[in-house]
Each structure stands twice: as structure tokens, then as C-alpha cells.
């Protein structure tokens, strides 16, 4: 099975570093998916969520305010200005990380419809876990 390695890095440190099945990124021209053996490219990323599918088909979510993605055949490196890994072992931890993600995205998004759609998608992915 082909592997895809994903790294998400901010000025504060590494947010994510693991092998994944696929990743959906908020590109500046629209969302796009990346699978193993994807063509090489560099893309600007806008405020939104990164939907990560691991090898067990479980989805994780990372919210970013903006950044760049460098994609090679087997590796995706995301350099983000700010990012929040939406996770938690309890309902309160999950609620806190969701709120931090909302605040991060809201600080960069002037389009209220796009903001609402992004938040709704993020909440749906988290609920589906």
C-alpha cells in the first residue's frame, strides 16, 4: 500500500506528523484532495480546515488561518501561520479546541458565508468520529 506522510508545522512547533491515507486542503482556489503518488506542487492555503484520513479511515481535523503546502509523491508539508488540532479526550477538551479553531478561522475570514460553511464542516467531521 502506498503511503502519504503529512507534516503540519507552525512557528510555534509541529502540530501533526504521521502517515495518512489522504488529506483535503483548503487551497486558495478551492479545496483539493491529496492521495499517495500525487503530482508535485506548491499551493497557497486559505483559512479553513485540513481533513486528515488516517490508515484506519478515522478523520482528524486541523484548522489553519493560512499557509503553504508543498506536495511531493509521498509527502505533504504544510507551513501554517497558525493552526489548531481539534482533539480532546473529554467533551470539555473537545469543546475548547473547537472554540480555539473557530476563533482562529474567524480572525482571518471576512466572508461570513465561507466562515459558517467551514465551521459547519469542521463540526460535522468531529461529530462523525
From Swiss-Prot:
GO terms for cellular component: plasma membrane; proton-transporting ATP synthase complex. GO terms for molecular function: ATP binding; proton-transporting ATP synthase activity, rotational mechanism. Gene3D superfamilies: F0F1 ATP synthase delta/epsilon subunit, N-terminal. The keyword Lipoprotein does not apply. The keyword Metal-binding does not apply. Coiled coil: none annotated. Pfam families: ATP-synt_DE_N (PF02823). InterPro entries: ATP_synth_F1_dsu/esu, ATP_synth_F1_dsu/esu_N, ATPsynth_dsu/esu_N. It is found in: Cell inner membrane. Keywords: ATP synthesis, Cell inner membrane, Cell membrane, CF(1), Hydrogen ion transport, Ion transport, Membrane, Transport. It is a peripheral membrane protein. Belongs to the ATPase epsilon chain family. Produces ATP from ADP in the presence of a proton gradient across the membrane. NCBIfam families: ATP_synt_epsi. F-type ATPases have 2 components, CF(1) - the catalytic core - and CF(0) - the membrane proton channel. CF(1) has five subunits: alpha(3), beta(3), gamma(1), delta(1), epsilon(1). CF(0) has three main subunits: a, b and c. This is ATP synthase epsilon chain. The gene is atpC.
Amino acid at each position: 500500500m502506498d503511503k502519504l506522510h503529512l507534516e503540519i508545522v507552525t512557528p510555534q512547533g509541529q502540530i501533526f506528523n504521521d502517515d495518512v491515507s489522504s488529506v483535503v486542503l483548503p487551497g486558495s482556489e478551492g479545496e483539493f484532495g491529496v492521495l499517495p503518488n500525487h503530482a508535485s506542487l506548491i499551493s497557497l492555503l486559505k483559512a479553513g480546515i485540513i481533513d486528515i484520513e488516517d490508515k484506519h479511515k478515522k478523520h482528524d481535523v486541523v484548522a489553519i488561518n493560512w499557509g503553504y503546502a508543498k506536495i511531493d509523491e509521498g509527502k505533504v508539508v504544510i507551513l501554517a501561520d497558525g493552526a489548531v488540532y481539534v482533539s480532546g479526550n473529554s467533551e470539555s477538551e473537545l469543546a475548547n479546541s473547537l472554540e480555539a479553531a473557530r476563533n482562529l478561522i474567524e480572525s482571518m475570514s471576512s466572508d461570513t458565508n465561507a466562515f459558517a460553511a467551514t465551521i459547519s464542516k469542521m463540526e460535522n467531521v468531529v461529530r462523525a468520529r
